[in-house]
Amino acid sequence: MTTQFDNVSVVKKANIYFDGKCVSHTVLFADGTKKTIGIIFPSTLKFNTGAAEIMELNAGKCRIRLAGATEWNTYEGGQQFEVPANSSFDIETVDTLDYVCHFI
């Protein structure tokens, strides 16, 4: 996992979801790809996906339950998890979660 992204454009307007519990900014790359960099404050939320995603966790800890699953899996800073396209996942955070969402 890289510690910085070079030669990118950042959308100034924040993406604010769930009454401010999740805040991110979109990062645009020269090759046309995009990522979001953000934080999720302590909460339990459900996210829907359009594109497949890799959620890279920089700091914090969370529990994830993918659509159709019954079990929760725990992830923390330095780990990542993948979510299929046109799906959803539940996320529970106790501490603030710092993440990068890679759209794949």
UniProtKB/Swiss-Prot annotation:
Reaction(s) this enzyme catalyzes, per UniProt: a purine D-ribonucleoside + phosphate = a purine nucleobase + alpha-D-ribose 1-phosphate; adenosine + phosphate = alpha-D-ribose 1-phosphate + adenine; cytidine + phosphate = cytosine + alpha-D-ribose 1-phosphate; guanosine + phosphate = alpha-D-ribose 1-phosphate + guanine
Group of enzyme by EC: transferase
Gene Ontology MF, one: uridine phosphorylase activity
Domain of life per record: Bacteria
One family name in Pfam for this protein: Ppnp
One cellular-component annotation, GO: cytosol
E.C. numbers: 2.4.2.1, 2.4.2.2
Protein's UniProt keywords contain Transferase: yes
Keywords, comma-separated and alphabetical: Glycosyltransferase, Transferase
HAMAP family: Nucleos_phosphorylase_PpnP
General function of this protein: Catalyzes the phosphorolysis of diverse nucleosides, yielding D-ribose 1-phosphate and the respective free bases. Can use uridine, adenosine, guanosine, cytidine, thymidine, inosine and xanthosine as substrates. Also catalyzes the reverse reactions.
Family to which this protein belongs: Belongs to the nucleoside phosphorylase PpnP family.
Name used for this protein in its record: Pyrimidine/purine nucleoside phosphorylase
Organism from which the protein derives: Herminiimonas arsenicoxydans
Lineage: Bacteria, Pseudomonadati, Pseudomonadota, Betaproteobacteria, Burkholderiales
Encoding gene per record: ppnP
